[in-house]
UniProtKB/Swiss-Prot annotation:
Result when mutating residue 216 to S: Significantly increased inhibition by apamin (IC(50)=167 pM). No effect on inhibition by d-tubocurarine and tetraethylammonium (TEA). Significant increase in inhibition by apamin (IC(50)=26 pM)
One Pfam family of this chain: Ion_trans_2
Positions with biased composition (Acidic residues): 65-76
Gene responsible for this protein: KCNN1
Name of the protein described by the UniProt record: Small conductance calcium-activated potassium channel protein 1
Protein species of origin: Homo sapiens (Human)
Membrane-crossing segments per the record: 111-131, 140-160, 179-199, 228-248, 277-297, 346-366
Length: 543
């Protein structure tokens, strides 16, 4: 049986046809080209069917190990594509950047639909109170529009968290998305969906609302709409504004800033972005936050009090703004008070926010009025110069009065005691002023010492470190030069030690010539004069 006919799980026809694989060797005389051992469309299915062995139907009779390896690689690539896991670092970075952009767009769309739902809710509430009723078709249409925007918002929130889970998988190299679904993440997603799902549903639903009036303490019963309880929590959707600010912040999107923050163990979140904005433009942030909170709280108080305020004091928008303003500033005149627990709760939160904003305003104003470090240095320098001049003037006054006292007591024939007492008085005043200025100058020196903050100390330490590093480098260079000089001195010393021997050898007289010895004849002398000369003759001639 051919190894490509059955794989244990998928049955194929073994007859001739498009789906059949060749089981016999191809006939070269049939006029048809030889078929491949298996079709490309069945590679993934056949890859792990049986161990690789030579195929008898192969036109060349080669084993199928190479084809099986290629099938395994294709299976692995298919599994990577199916799991969404990139194949290398470049693909992972590109996929991560694309997920970042998709998450940013989803956050923008979620904020747009969330704000759209709030605007339509406020419009429907105001129109249903003064223009038409809750039973009208216009109210039903606006509520349907709110429900549609809420459904789209919920879908966008789900997609946003799906992108976040994909980013978690890419960053941590996870293969299963359920790894990222911790209990905390599930709770936060559920809470966010619950907050975004609150909205006034289409229809007219009422309930009995009982309250006690503020000054008369008389009970007040009214038939209120359920939309009041479902409309006010819609302002919780404004948390999406902080998410959009974070995702669009240059600090969050800049790779260099994120790298530096990671090295310094800084988490880039909404809190960090708000701190940065409070450092850059604190006045603008406080102004926008205060005005927004003021308007939202005033409208909420108006909606809460409209069913029990028969005199239209707090149910009027201007009256509600006055109540919120005096509560925000912690004044509390008492001319206007809320009747319902809803209005009292809003006023309580307004008072807490007002206390916090007041503290922030005081801190911001104090920081703005404080001199900078450069201004402090300039101010201290100018004060020191003025004090130095005043001390010099006081010393000159002391010398002048001393001379005048001496002049009017010793250099005149008849001293004028009144003038002498006058100059003595000025003399004592000059001495006292000089002593006082010296003490003031000492205090000024203490202020200068206090002006050296931790930043100045850190800067001084950095400068000292640079100086020490430079001195260390110069010291190493000097040591290298000294080592080179020492080696040269050693060589020069060795040369000087060998110099006497060379001089003695140069001035030594040559030895006297030796007397000739009688003996050999001319042939022996010729042989002795060239004993090492070689000629291509018999060896006996050299011996």
């Amino acid at each position: 049986m051919n190894s490509h006919s059955y794989n244990g799980s998928v049955g194929r026809p073994l007859g001739s046809g498009p789906g059949a694989l060749g089981r016999d060797p191809p006939d070269p005389e049939a006029g048809h080209p030889p078929q491949p051992p298996h079709s490309p469309g069945l590679q993934v299915v056949v890859a792990k069917s049986e161990p690789a062995r030579p195929s008898p139907g192969s036109p060349r009779g080669q084993p199928q190990d190479q084809d099986d390896d290629e099938d395994d690689e294709e299976d692995e690539a298919g599994r990577q594509r199916a799991s969404g896991k990139p194949s290398n670092v470049g693909h992972r970075l590109g996929h991560r950047r694309a997920l970042f952009e998709k998450r940013k767009r989803l956050s923008d769309y979620a904020l747009i639909f969330g704000m759209f739902g709030i605007v339509v809710m406020v419009t429907e509430t105001e129109l249903s109170w003064g223009v038409y009723t809750k039973e009208s078709l216009y109210s039903f249409a606006l509520k349907c529009l709110i429900s549609l925007s809420t459904a789209i918002l919920l879908g966008l929130v789900v997609l946003y968290h799906a992108r976040e889970i994909q980013l978690f998988m890419v960053d941590n190299g996870a293969d299963d998305w359920r790894i990222a679904m911790t209990c905390e993440r599930v709770f936060l997603i559920s809470l966010e969906l619950a907050v975004c799902a609150i909205h006034p549903v289409p229809g007219h639903y009422r309930f009995t609302w009982t309250a006690r009036l503020a000054f008369t303490y008389a009970p007040s019963v009214a038939e209120a709409d359920v939309d009041v309880l479902l409309s006010i929590p819609m302002f919780l959707r404004l948390y999406l504004l902080g998410r959009v600010m974070l995702l669009h912040s240059k600090i969050f999107t800049d790779a260099s800033s994120r790298s530096i923050g990671a090295l310094n163990k800084i988490t880039f979140n909404t809190r960090f972005v708000m701190k940065t904005l409070m450092t850059i433009c604190p006045g603008t942030v406080l102004l926008v936050f205060s005005i927004s909170s003021w308007i939202i709280a005033a409208w909420t108080v108006r909606v809460c009090e409209r069913y029990h305020d028969k005199q239209e004091v707090t149910s009027n928008f201007l009256g509600a703004m006055w109540l919120i303003s005096i509560t925000f500033l912690s004044i509390g005149y008492g001319d206007m008070v809320p009747h319902t627990y809803c209005g009292k709760g809003v006023c309580l939160l307004t008072g807490i926010m007002g206390a916090g904003c007041t503290a922030l305003v005081v801190a911001v104003v104090a920081r703005k009025l404080e001199l900078t470090k450069a201004e402090k240095h300039v101010h201290n320098f100018m004060m020191d110069t003025q004090l130095t001049k005043r001390v010099k003037n006081a010393a000159a006054n002391v010398l002048r009065e001393t001379w005048l006292i001496y002049k009017h007591t010793r250099l005149v024939k008849k001293p004028d005691q009144a003038r002498v007492r006058k100059h003595q008085r000025k003399f004592l005043q000059a001495i006292h002023q000089a002593q006082k200025l010296r003490s003031v100058k000492i205090e000024q020196g203490k202020l200068n010492d206090q002006a050296n903050t931790l930043t100045d100390l850190a800067k001084t330490q950095t400068v000292m470190y640079d100086l020490v590093s430079e001195l260390h480098a110069q010291h190493e260079e000097l040591e290298a030069r000294l080592a080179t000089l020492e080696s040269r001195l050693d060589a020069l010393g060795a040369s000087l030690q060998a110099l006497p021997g060379l001089i003695a050898q140069a001035i030594r007289p040559p030895p006297p010539p030796l007397p000739p010895r009688p003996g050999p004849g001319p042939q022996d002398q010729a042989a002795r004069s060239s004993p090492c000369r070689w000629t291509p003759v018999a060896p006996s001639d050299c011996g």
